[in-house]
Structure formats: C-alpha cells, structure tokens
From Swiss-Prot:
Family membership: Belongs to the bacterial ribosomal protein bS6 family.
Protein name (record): Small ribosomal subunit protein bS6
Keywords tagged on the record: Ribonucleoprotein, Ribosomal protein, RNA-binding, rRNA-binding
Pfam family, one: Ribosomal_S6
Gene Ontology MF, one: structural constituent of ribosome
Organism: Aromatoleum aromaticum (strain DSM 19018 / LMG 30748 / EbN1)
Length: 128
C-alpha cells in the first residue's frame, strides 16, 4: 500500500456537514484495509483566489495509507460531491503523523495569545 496526503476544500455553506464527510471518506479508506495516519480539520480559511465566487472555504487534511482502488473510490467521491470545491492527492514516501505547519502555527498563535490575555487581567486589577 502507498502513502498519500489528501487535502480537500469544502464550500463554506456546507461546513456543518464536514464531520459527516470526513467519516464517509475515512470509511472508504478503512473498508479496503487502509489506514488514516493523520487527520486535521483546518476550519474555515481565506482562499488565495475565489473559486465559484467563494472567498472562504473549509479545509481538511488527511494522511492515508491505501491501495489504488481505495484512492480511486475516494477521488470519485470527491468529484461527485458538489460541496467539495477542490481536492489534491499527493503521493508521499512514508506515513506522516506529525502536526502540519498549519496546525503548528495555529497552536503557537493560541499559546502566545493566551498569556497575553492573562497578563492583561492583573493590570486591570491594579488600576482599579
């Protein structure tokens, strides 16, 4: 079996259906003895350019290990789902389980934002 990195972009009006879509795509991979090594829901983000007059979309990243038939079935599901604006499948040499740069950036942003809000609270208490 080969390793793949799969990213798909979902129309923002269909964001509430993303968890069900993820489960459906996971089922396609695991039904053929494939594995999901990493699954990241990046949420709604600004796109670099509009697709179908939409400027924001819901992004999902999956690192999977599967055979060609499962991959073909997955791509077929992407093509015939109107909510999926774009999808990209890239073959990788090995399984990737570490957090993606997008998630690392988001985590560091949340860590730096949290202490700043904590520091602001004592300053307000001192001025009161």
């Amino acid at each position: 079996m080969r390793h793949y990195e799969v990213v798909f972009i979902v129309h923002p009006d269909q964001s509430e259906q993303v968890p069900a879509m993820i489960e459906r795509y996971k089922a396609i991979v695991t039904a053929r003895n494939g594995q999901i090594h990493r699954l990241e829901d990046w949420g709604r983000r600004q796109m670099a350019y509009p697709i179908q007059k939409v400027h924001k979309a819901h992004y999902v990243l999956m690192n999977i290990e599967c055979d060609g038939e499962a991959l073909g079935e997955l791509e077929h599901a992407f093509k015939f789902n109107d909510a999926v604006l774009r999808h990209l499948v890239v073959k990788t040499k090995a399984a990737v389980t570490t957090p993606s740069p997008m998630m690392k950036e988001e985590k560091s942003r949340s860590l730096t934002a949290a202490p700043a809000t904590d520091e602001a609270k004592p300053a307000e208490a001192e001025s009161a």
